[in-house]
Amino acid sequence: MSSEKDKKNSCSKFSLSVVAAILASMSGLSNCSDLYAVGSSADHPAYLIPQAGLLLDHIKDIFIGPKDSQDKGQYKLIIGEAGSFQDSNAETLPQKVEHSTLFSVTTPIIVQGIDQQDQVSSQGLVCNFSGDHSEEIFERESFLGIAFLGNGSKDGITLTDIKSSLSGAALYSSDDLIFERIKGDIELSSCSSLERGGACSAQSILIHDCQGLTVKHCAAGVNVEGVSASDHLGFGGGAFSTTSSLSGEKSLYMPAGDIVVATCDGPVCFEGNSAQLANGGAIAASGKVLFVANEKKISFTDNQALSGGAISASSSISFQNCAELVFKSNLAKGVKDKCSLGGGALASLESVVLKDNLGITYEKNQSYSEGGAIFGKDCEIFENRGPVVFRDNTAALGGGAILAQQTVAICGNKSGISFEGSKSSFGGAIACGNFSSENNSSALGSIDISNNLGDISFLRTLCTTSDLGQTDYQGGGALFAENISLSENAGAITFKDNIVKTFASNGKMLGGGAILASGNVLISKNSGEISFVGNARAPQAIPTRSSDELSFGAQLTQTTSGCSGGGALFGKEVAIVQNATVVFEQNRLQCGEQETHGGGGAVYGMESASIIGNSFVRFGNNYAVGNQISGGALLSKKVRLAENTRVDFSRNIATFCGGAVQVSDGSCELINNGYVLFRDNRGQTFGGAISCLKGDVIISGNKDRVEFRDNIVTRPYFEENEEKVETADINSDKQEAEERSLLENIEQSFITATNQTFFLEEEKLPSEAFISAEELSKRRECAGGAIFAKRVYITDNKEPILFSHNFSDVYGGAIFTGSLQETDKQDVVTPEVVISGNDGDVIFSGNAAKHDKHLPDTGGGAICTQNLTISQNNGNVLFLNNFACSGGAVRIEDHGEVLLEAFGGDIIFNGNSSFRAQGSDAIYFAGKDSRIKALNATEGHAIVFQDALVFENIEERKSSGLLVINSQENEGYTGSVRFLGSESKVPQWIHVQQGGLELLHGAILCSYGVKQDPRAKIVLSAGSKLKILDSEQENNAEIGDLEDSVNSEKTPSLWIGKNAQAKVPLVDIHTISIDLASFSSKAQETPEEAPQVIVPKGSCVHSGELSLELVNTTGKGYENHALLKNDTQVSLMSFKEENDGSLEDLSKLSVSDLRIKVSTPDIVEETYGHMGDWSEATIQDGALVINWHPTGYKLDPQKAGSLVFNALWEEEAVLSTLKNARIAHNLTIQRMEFDYSTNAWGLAFSSFRELSSEKLVSVDGYRGSYIGASAGIDTQLMEDFVLGISTASFFGKMHSQNFDAEISRHGFVGSVYTGFLAGAWFFKGQYSLGETHNDMTTRYGVLGESNATWKSRGVLADALVEYRSLVGPARPKFYALHFNPYVEVSYASAKFPSFVEQGGEARAFEETSLTNITVPFGMKFELSFTKGQFSETNSLGIGCAWEMYRKVEGRSVELLEAGFDWEGSPIDLPKQELRVALENNTEWSSYFSTALGVTAFCGGFSSMDNKLGYEANAGMRLIF
């Protein structure tokens, strides 16, 4: 038996002989049906006949060459000379086939098993050696090279296991190689060459209009080493290779060096091909590679080379208008330092173009250099019709999926685009730039993703720095370039779970878990949601290296100067503009200990970040962790959030500044947005929500609410966790668990800090070890629970601004302005907070700054600043329930000023407290030179201090100047400055120029002096004190102005000076208003203390004229039941002087010596309440008193209770409406016609009535309305006799005609009814019983409101007789007209039980009933139409009702607080009523009927009366 080696040699020799015969007889044989060559078979003869023919005209349609060459002659057959090349020497080979050869393929060509690699010059099964072409040949010939032209459905070419030593083991042409219309498959497999083109090599290759192409396991052995850079990617080709140098770079048919696969209608497959030492595992071209208009799947699988694992080209690579493209598991194994460019699938020195394809997939391609799937100068993916997928591609350096040196454009695609699971050192999915290894320099390009219709996603990409060599840029988990644009895309754009692991280095930019751009990032005009979720940048441990490398690593660590940032996005300038929805969620930035610059858990814009015009923006659950790492969500030099419909920053965390936003240099602007929310953000040092270290925070022009809630800045300690972050492995499950644990620990540390008790007494605080000065300095650097800035402007917002439950460890629970670092305090900018021009309320509620006994000089529960200005606001400004060590609401630092103006709303301080004040504390003035500049309020508005004003170091202060209340510079300042219930010590002279200064609820106001101008008013309540402090301070210029005003005023007043020579008054008051509402005469209460004026010991009275007027600040007037119900003595005023803390009667002023005029409130005709007399003022025990003696009570009509009694009328009205509906629709002639039948029916009803009269205003009318539904069943027990039952439910409302009172009503009604027809007489009767639940609210304005609930019941019994008179023929056929007079008797009764109201001005009502008997009468016109089973009756009724009997029982009402009772009554309705009714009853068949009815009514015959209303109903019935 022969050996395998012998068989192989035999096969080879036989195959060569067949090939020799073919080539030798090409011009001599006359017939050819099959070309077949195989090793041991002699049954397949070889025939070949040259056939003249033309290439199809449409070949020219895809002509790639110069346009002017398309018109050069016709394609004709050129037959080469006969010869046998295998017997010739290599030197003579080019002369054997000198011209082109055209093969007509009509049956399959199969050749396999030819191995010529042991022959040094073996080249090609079919060869063309044309040599250099003269111009004469080019002018004469239209085609040069080898062409296979199919001519039938069975044609095909199979070339298998062919090997040669030179290029093109199967086919070689120094000119073109063309496959045209081969409708059987073209299969080239296991072909190999020791040079280029394992299967085919030519000057250019065209495969056109063929059935399919399969190229497998071909290999090229050429070595690319030493090839110039310009020819580098065209050198190789495991299967196909083209080079433009074979024929002097000339080609008649297509450009030299190009490979084109066009309009093939079968699959194209390149699998397992390789060029181990060169480029282009499947294809290498010195020109272009073009796949165009192919109809079936094109796949490149498991190919490998140094660069371009599947395809490499010196020019462009294009796939256009093809079906599905698949590139899978291709490998570019060359490394960067060996001059390999990369491109796991494709590598081009020009553009890679993917256009108008039905689907594209790049999966598990790998590059040991750059571009895991694609490498090129430019990459264009546009107008594809199917999905584009890059999955699990890997690059050792940049561009896990794509690396382009200049631009990447992904535009106009119609379906989805996804990049998943890619890995690289930078640019996990796409990197754009020329990353030269020389001097670590990089020239970055741009990425444009725009106008795509489908969703775009970048998922689970990973960047892991593989070496310390690339230090300029590290990051870009998904995208990396100089400029990146995502614009005008219609689908959703998602960046999720992309991660960057980088070394801490002295590089310029480190980070960008999803996007890294050295220039601009523009995300604009996208219609779908844009989401960045779960992206991260984390430090990577420096790998184990040699001692020299370790030394370099240590040096690198020490010289870190780059910026680390952007858990999701890092760019120089970031603009997110006019998108639909933008979400940054759960992105994170983790930095090692040596990285001390940067931040931005989600976004880092080095120069600016602009988020403008988006519909919805959310930054949630992002965090930035590391040493001095700021901006839990966003970091930039300047930030602008403008014109967004909704903005939400929630649960972001930073371990240095700016829990949500950090602005490092410029300003942070929140301008012209809709709803803005900053909630649950956490910062460690400055700014729980926003930190703006060197600029301003501007909140202006927003059109919806702006809320800062539950933000915290505190100092947690978690050094152990930071160490874990630095050394963890990003790929391990353990790392993910540690990251989650880290975030949980950070959050818990914030929670623990904020949960500490605020109000512990100093001695009850736990003991602590000695705190060093350095530690105290660190503790002090914590401020701005919501905002930290140089200045804060809250202006011109349209809706409320809310700061709620924000917390700071030290300063400013909500807002801090200024600096805590000495280097920044030299700034000439004065820290200030300005709240101005807002239309909505501005509210600070529940904010807090923690008390630390080691830092007593801290605070500002809501605001800590130097200057505070609140002015020109149309809404209220409220400080409610804030807390701090000092300044429960506001802390003003030394040299600061406060200017408050209540313009279109009030300014209120209520419930604020501090540890230092041990209670109430509105504003704390620190240092010796802080002060209040002015307090102004416009008419109807007030500045209200329910908490104290506290000044530090009162005794040591220099003169704090003049405090002006309601400056006369604006005549509109006539409102009030009101102190309630607390003691405020203001070390300033107070000048009340106009408007009012009010001390209520026992308030104490201490100052250096008080002056009242003629237009000003001072109001004191019981127990309040106006106290003058003893001051040695010198008068400043402002006090001199006060002295000038004193000298110019001539109004008589109580003028008290420090001594007889004083020119500036301690007290200069002409009128004091005493608040009557503050006094009470209840026996169980202690008598109220008289208001006091207290001056220092030794004060001198210069004049003693004073007017006292009794006023009521609550507006109750004589409705003050507690004071005026009984005889009362009111202490009006007393004057004291303070001597060593004790109070004595003013020694130089006796009340009896005062010329005091007392005026009491007038009692006029419109005055309601307690009536009585005031006595003359008298002196008792050194106090001025006045007595009140009541004589009666005058009832306000709004308390009369008419609406309660009128509800009885409404109770009867519901019963009457149901009665009328049953008479109109259930007790009719139509119903009586169905003897012994049963009807089930349903009815909807409604009514409206307005009852009023000029004569009845004193009793009060009402408007009532209700709707309801009723259902019932009736039957005929005998002929012409019907009996039925029904039930109904309803709800409605009653409104008082004249006052603010209403009743909501709902109830049920049950009824029985009957009818009997006796000839022309129709008798009808019914009985109804109802129950109604009533809820009443009465509002009295300043007197409060009352509420009551009760149930009322009603009964109605009715009997009616109707005489039916026929008009017209005695026996009508279709139409009948009846005239029916009727008379009716109706009895109705309604009542309610006794009940008592709750609330202010509560009343007690006695049980009351209303009974009446009414006799309605009138006439009804009926027109009936009958045809078959159809019957319709329309009627018009006109009637009048006369009330014959009316009785009201009960009616007693008592005003409980006043102790006054009276007899109430319902409205005295007119006893006549006119009604007009329109009704329709239609029987559609013997089983179904419908009903409609409308009734209008009015009451009385006098124009003075007014009783109007309507009733409407609609229903149906089923007849059984």
From Swiss-Prot:
Residues 1233-1520 form the Autotransporter domain. Keywords: Cell outer membrane, Cell wall, Membrane, Secreted, Signal, Transmembrane, Transmembrane beta strand. Residues 1-20 form the signal peptide. One of its GO terms (cellular component) is cell outer membrane. It is found in: Secreted, Cell wall; Cell outer membrane. InterPro entries: Autotransporte_beta, Autotransporte_beta_dom_sf, Polymorphic_membr_middle, POMP_repeat. It holds the Pfam family Chlam_PMP. The keyword Cell membrane does not apply. It is a peripheral membrane protein. The keyword Membrane applies. Belongs to the PMP outer membrane protein family. This is Probable outer membrane protein PmpD. It comes from Chlamydia muridarum (strain MoPn / Nigg). The lineage of its organism: Bacteria, Pseudomonadati, Chlamydiota, Chlamydiia, Chlamydiales.
